[in-house]
Amino acid sequence: MYAVIKTGGKQYRVQEGDTLRVEKINADEGATITLDEVLLVANEDNIQVGAPYIEGGKVSATVKTHGRGEKIRIIKLRRRKHHRKRMGHRQYFTELHIDNISTG
């Protein structure tokens, strides 16, 4: 069984037992959270598609850790002016462990 969920403006395909990194969620480490924006749930023989979400569809997950991703380096350059600007960015993430998928 797998599901497609939406969190942080992105969509993820998850199964029970998966570990994935999503945009930062304000929850304590070790806490259990419920993701209720479920777009699709599929078994071996049955597929449910929401319009836009499945009524009563829920995915339970445990927050494993919080952190910051790899650094992305940006260089802006103005040609012929000897002007350069270097910047970097590290995005915050939350690592989740998927415990249960239910259709309601």
UniProtKB/Swiss-Prot annotation:
InterPro entries: bL21-like (IPR028909), bL21-like_sf (IPR036164), Ribosomal_bL21 (IPR001787), Ribosomal_bL21_CS (IPR018258). Coiled coil: none annotated. The keyword Aminoacyl-tRNA synthetase does not apply. GO terms for cellular component: cytoplasm; ribonucleoprotein complex; ribosome. The keyword Plastid does not apply. One of its GO terms (biological process) is translation. GO terms for molecular function: rRNA binding; structural constituent of ribosome. It comes from the Bacteria. Keywords: Ribonucleoprotein, Ribosomal protein, RNA-binding, rRNA-binding. It holds the Pfam family Ribosomal_L21p. Part of the 50S ribosomal subunit. Contacts protein L20. Belongs to the bacterial ribosomal protein bL21 family. This protein binds to 23S rRNA in the presence of protein L20. This is Large ribosomal subunit protein bL21. It comes from Nitrosococcus oceani (strain ATCC 19707 / BCRC 17464 / JCM 30415 / NCIMB 11848 / C-107). The lineage of its organism: Bacteria, Pseudomonadati, Pseudomonadota, Gammaproteobacteria, Chromatiales.
